Amino acid sequence: MIDRRALLASALALAACEKNASAAPAIAPTPLTSIAPFPIGTSALTGQFEDRAWVDLCLTHTSQLTPEWEMKMEYILSETGEYRWDAPDRIAEFCTTHGLRLFGTTLIWYSQDSAFFRSLDPQRFRTEYDRYIQTVAQRYRGRATGWDVVNEAVAEDGNGLRSCLWSEALGQDGYIARAFEQAKLADPDAVLFLNDYNLENLPTKGATFLRLVERLLKAGVPIGGIGTQSHLDIEIPAGQTAAFFREAARFGLPIHVSELDASLRAEARFDTRSQRQRIEQQTARVAELTSAFMDLPPAQRFAFTVWGLRDTDSWLRRDARDDGKDSPLLFDAAGRANPMFGAVAEAIRAG
């Protein structure tokens, strides 16, 4: 996965600039919240709250917000161990004001730790690890309906678990179990998720992830839900996404499609497919994902979150390789529904 840390550096400024963009009026499609029997979510940066068009689109089509970056450790915890609450609190207040669910991400992630932990002795490390999780989760207790407690624990290729600062100090299963235990103490009512990516795209990784879930549950770890980011590769075989969802459903846990997008970018140098052909692949894969989610028992459909509203809000559009033409989300820059929106809506209606 591309490192989103570098890409997010300019995101807040970009969001603020977009509020001044002019766009032709669009015919508004039926709001997804009016047809979906589950919460529809999106990601948010506080700069987007100043963009009236973004706010209107958000309040029309979504019922849940996930902070894109400003509730991660890299933002909250300084190198000296001080906590910063301005942006996370503002997102929580926005949700309260507008009647949206708040979903927190992420308490522990290999990619965005804090330099604060790197100089600690083992005992202090454990103490501060517990303190961080409890401090953040307790602050939003009663407001956050759920948390990505641990994000991206499985190795990139799916062969085993990822080595990171947390696993080196607390063990590969140990840091995960400890994080869930501390989060449960901090907020017993929140749904606690193990979240990862490429679970549909790479069957090996999906299988490793589900074995991890099974192992932790057998050990008594209080995992309350399964999160699949669903950054979909539009070229995966038909049926592969549905197969993963069938396997994941066997635990009976709530499942969160937590970061959906589907890039149209041609990765192969000599890819000769037309844009229309790529859109057909995209909508087919997104429709399959939505149908697989709809096939879950109602109690297991936690939420369906798209990682951004407009194409220009996407982290993929902040990538240096972006040509300004990728369309990975439900709406274009002007807030008009993309074909991907229709794929989601039609799959929901089909039940």
Task: List the predicted regions and their residue ranges.
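Acidic-and-aromatic substrate-binding clefts and catalytic sites of carbohydrate-active enzymes
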Residues: S43-W54, M73-D86, V154-E156, L199-T208, ...
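Substrate-binding cleft and catalytic face of glycoside hydrolase catalytic domains
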Residues: T66-E70, P88-A169, D173-V191, Y197-L199, ...
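C-terminal segment of N-terminal export signals and the immediately downstream linker at the start
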Residues: K19-S43
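Glycoside hydrolase catalytic-domain groove-lining segments
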Residues: D173-R178, L185, D189-V191, G206-R211, ...
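Aromatic-rich peripheral "rim/lid" segments of glycoside hydrolase catalytic domains that contact
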Residues: D148, E152-G158, R162-A169, Q240-E247, ...
